[in-house]
Swiss-Prot record:
Highest rank taxon of the organism: Eukaryota
Pfam annotation, one family: HIN
Span list, region Disordered: 88-196, 388-442
All residue ranges annotated as the HIN-200 domain in the record: 193-393, 566-765
Alphabetized UniProt keyword annotations: Acetylation, Activator, Apoptosis, Autophagy, Cytoplasm, DNA-binding, Immunity, Inflammatory response, Innate immunity, Isopeptide bond, Nucleus, Phosphoprotein, Repeat, Repressor, Transcription, Transcription regulation, Ubl conjugation
Composition skew (Basic residues), residue ranges: 88-99
GO-annotated molecular function: double-stranded DNA binding
InterPro entries: DAPIN, DEATH-like_dom_sf, HIN-200, HIN200/IF120x, NA-bd_OB-fold
Entry protein name: Gamma-interferon-inducible protein 16
Amino acid sequence: MEKKYKNIVLLKGLEVINDYHFRMVKSLLSNDLKLNLKMREEYDKIQIADLMEEKFRGDAGLGKLIQIFKDIPTLEDLAETLKKEKLKAKGLAPSRKRKKEVDAASPAPSTSSTVKTEGAEATPGAQKRKKTTKEKSGPKGSKVSKEQTQPPCPAGAGMSTAMGRSPSPKTSSSAPPNTSSTENPKTVAKCQATPRRSVLQKGPVIVKVLSTTKPFEYETPEMEKKIMFHATVATQTQFFHVKVLNTSLKEKFNGKKIIIISDYLEYDSLLEVNEESTVSEAGPNQKFEVPNKIINRAKETLKIDILHKQASGNIVYGVFTLHKKTVNQKTTIYKIQDDRGKMDVVGTGQCHNIPCEEGDKLQLYCFRLRKKNQMSTLISEMHSFIQIKKKTNPRNNDPKSMKLPQEQSQLPNPSEAGTTFPESHLWTPQMPPTTPSSSFFTKKSEDTISKMNDFMRMQILKEESHFPGPFMTSIGPAESYPHTPQMPPSTPSSSFLTTKSEDTISKMNDFMRMQILKEESHFPRPFMTSIGPAESYPHTPQMPPSTPSSSFLTTWKPKLQTEPEEVSIEDSAQSDLKEVMVLNATESFVYEPKEQKKMFHATVATEKEVFRVKVFNIDLKEKFTPKKIIAISNYVCRNGFLEVYPFTLVADVNADPKMEIPKGLIRSANITPKINQLCSQTKGSFVNGVFEVHKKNVRGEFTYYEIQDNTGKMEVVVHGRLTTINCEEGDKLKLTCFELAPKSGNTGELRSVIHSHIKVIKTRKNKKDILNPDSSMETSPDFFF
């Protein structure tokens, strides 16, 4: 009998509670078990169960554990479960004592029992008890924010996540209302509010940010649209999942910052930060390191068979593999699996019909565990969120396909000697033909990417490029290939294939990567193979230059020369919220005639910085109206540009006080660089500006414009759709997103790329002052776009 009791204590009691509650249990048992400080810190659940068996002869401490759980509001349901298990172990049918137990329990109010039990049949007595509970818990519940009382992830449960000792979190956090093993369908459908005991913490807590999600939009029961994000933070002894309902704090939760949080709500191990909360960065003397064991717990995902044993109502966080996806009218069923079982995830609202496919990883935030007919299901609620990590393409793991690009890169094209110009190898310093794979892909310092990733990258570059055929071998020198300059050896492939951490690897990054591979270069393919080594693959542009944005931004904001480098190297989806003012935007244009893909360029600014933006969602054109203040999130930083895709969030902002952009900053954003400055800049950067056409020459599929000012001349090479523009000598070209490419004599030339845009400004040839080379050098803000 005692063995049965110990099984219940360990497997159905201690095993399912979270770290926070386990530490609480150890503290409450410290006198009985003679636990000193070191033992309370180090003893695990098995050791505590052993001590309880030794101390409490007869029931292995089960009765004591039930009493402790009953005194913890969010564990009351678990206490009832243990009482039933104890009766079973005694050989008594639970049904016999059910009424008696309910009556005995009714006096004790429980904030976590306000919702109808998830069990199947609740007796009238049980229902009455719940009603009483609800009334008594009212005052305390009033402390909780309006949003908290909504069905979305009760905060209390939030901390009990599947991630990082999450199993337990679920129990405590989820304790909200659901207790039984099965769930009433109506309860799930309505997703009733689950009032739980929350405590307003005035005193500050110092934590380190471990990870954050991107901001996302959710809908309140009042049909109001709001934005929030999730975060994980930790002290030196425990971690917390955080719901941040104030997105203006996103910057505070970036990186691995040490921050101080005050006036937050706490339920168990979950923190909620809202408009009333205060968040500030910690001082130098408040820095600390989080132990690896805490970090690992925070990242931990519970096995599905463990989830099936968890109490209904728990909140779950974790990363799971998608086995099957079924889309209904208002819900989506995601069947997840691991090596221990399967489970359904029901997504509604923002979690409905997320773009994903079998084999992808779903990172779930704040999902409620529900039970019906002994079957467990994860249900999305108001604050739930799903982040997608795309599966790896199997073909990239094939040894043959991985070797192919390297072998090809070492075989020069037979026609190379006879068709290339002397300038065709001017970019070899950036990509030496003798060591194509090392100089092309390796990082100059930290070697964080393995050979396999290099081969995969080469395979992708080879397969995804869509350059037409034989064009380059016969008509142009190597430098007319636009994208080679963008890949110096110092720009590792890490920015292309990897992201800063697992939580930044998502569908957005994969979508961005594939989009770039398909669109970023449009010069015919054979050109590259016929004039130079394999490093000249068309997609080189995806590897940002060593100082990509510095050279790009110096064309219009010299003081940012050292800042953009980090931005352009990241080459990944950015989840931070950036508030900017729109300075100007081009008209929408078709950049991919075959598929009729459209985009437009824009310039935006904060009060300190200016950013060039590529917008691939023309539905946002109205948002990018000059002088509008907008917030952008989930954008992509690449090569000195912010790239806005369909998954990017763009919203109007009523700035108070109104954002004021310094006039000097606006002027710097609209300055056209002098040609002698361009000649000395790093090749591979991108240039915007207004230039006068001195000569025009059409050769085959290319159009060459010679532009000039009072400091020199330069050639602009145009290919594809832009060759059809109506432009004559003496006109002015307003160039947007032209690549500065190398040329013999180290003068360089500007080349059109797939996202380039030209606007022709017609001039009167009889007015020489308009033809003055200097007249296009300084432009007004309105004139630039």
